[in-house]
Amino acid sequence: MLGKKKIPIVFEDDSLLVCEKPAGMPVQSDTSGNVDVETYLKHYLFEKQEGDGEPYLTAVHRLDRPVGGLMVFAKTKEAAAKLSRQIQNHEFEKCYQAVVCGALPEEFGTFEDMLLRDGKTNTTKVVPA
């Protein structure tokens, strides 16, 4: 069911799980039928546990399908609530890096583009600002 793709787990304790999401993999299940990070991790936790029942696991933030990087998951409702508050209070820092082709006009700066979402296909693409 989960295929051969491995998702590296960077940190795990009783409350949190941090993994390295591969680029091209959705965080949650969608209509594509592809394996998603959340299902993979729930399977991993189910295999580790000593009881029956589905383990609690929820993503506390999102990364788009084309993006790879670290993902934080809460393993308890209490951890999910605390992390949600931290995000709302801007105490949760995210840092993005990008690979670009060609030469940039400046070494440093802010480069902005708009995202166009297609609700029918559940896809998003960059359009020039």
Tell what function each PLM region has.
Residues 1-129:
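RNA pseudouridine synthases
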